[in-house]
Amino acid sequence: MKPEEQVGQIVQRLEALESYRAPWESMWQDCTDYVNPRRGDFKAKQARGSATRFDKVFDSTAPLANEQLASGLHGHLTNTAERWFSLRVPGVEPTDSMSRWLQSTVDMMFERTFNVASSNFITAVHELYMDLGSYGTGVFFTEDRPGKSIGFRTFHLADCFVMENHEGVIDTVYRKYKHTARQLVQLYGPVLPKKIMDIAAKSPFQEFTCVHAVEPRADLNYDKKD
């Protein structure tokens, strides 16, 4: 498939997903207004840092309850003071040396990934728990950052569109968001079209609408184990 055809296909799928999700947006906007007003907008767009975000909150019960739920999930599932996961080799009884190696790997993962500020895990996972309590779902993203530790982010549900497979499992996520020309250059470098490179040189903060599509390969062979 030619790149232009692939782009056209992605745009068509995004438009279909936007239409499919539209009936839920009014309810999610209500959840934002009354339960999680800091999170952002689905339908009623407001300026960043707007002081009117909390205008509809006439009772703080729901926002406080959601904060308590998120804190409880954080403390029970991913407590920063505990080793909340372990490693093992399926079907293998570990020797003493294997157990020591696995435990040292767990310690390294906690120290260099999950409990270090540069990975953003602690902040991102708390945002995920806030979204789970507010909307019933959330989008947690793990990204490779060359030369740095793995990075974590929780994307705003308003930017994301999902699709289920035949088993009812989400296997496709589309994210529609904005990047400045400067950010695009930082991310993709010289492979960008000359037009965007020129804009970045003159107006680095000009924004572009971007689409991040994660979906199964069309030529995937399900009979292969890998």
Regions found by a protein language model. Give the residues of each.
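Extended, helix-rich architectural segments
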Residues: 1-225
